[in-house]
Structure formats: structure tokens, C-alpha cells
């Protein structure tokens, strides 16, 4: 009662194909892939340390 048989998955696949059509599924998967790629890029950009230049000013020691 709790598990799905092969026929259940086949029926679900047919319904999904009817709802979205053949051309829409690759577009959706492409959009998901682009989102994952940009997320990974954002995560690696955040890991890069901020290298700020520091300038040490020394007072002129004239006596």
C-alpha cells in the first residue's frame, strides 16, 4: 500500500509528459541547471577572502 509499483511511475511519467509537453521539460531542466550553477558560483565567490590593501603611515621622525 505504501510503495509505488512500476505501473504507478509509468502513469505519473505519462501525465507529466502530457502536462508539460516534450519541449518544456528540457527548458525546465536547463533553468534548474543554470540556477544550480549560479548558486555554486555565488558560494565560491563568498569563500574568497577579501584582500583589502592596507597602508601603514609612519610619522616623520625629524629631530
Curated annotation (Swiss-Prot):
It holds the Pfam family TatA_B_E. InterPro entries: TatA/B/E (IPR003369), TatA/E (IPR006312). Its main location: membrane. Residues 42-63 are annotated as: Disordered. It comes from the Bacteria. It is found in: Cell inner membrane. It is a single-pass membrane protein. One of its GO terms (molecular function) is protein transmembrane transporter activity. The chain crosses the membrane at residues 1-21. Part of the twin-arginine translocation (Tat) system that transports large folded proteins containing a characteristic twin-arginine motif in their signal peptide across membranes. TatA could form the protein-conducting channel of the Tat system. The Tat system comprises two distinct complexes: a TatABC complex, containing multiple copies of TatA, TatB and TatC subunits, and a separate TatA complex, containing only TatA subunits. Substrates initially bind to the TatABC complex, which probably triggers association of the separate TatA complex to form the active translocon. Belongs to the TatA/E family. This is Sec-independent protein translocase protein TatA. The lineage of its organism: Bacteria, Pseudomonadati, Pseudomonadota, Alphaproteobacteria, Hyphomicrobiales.
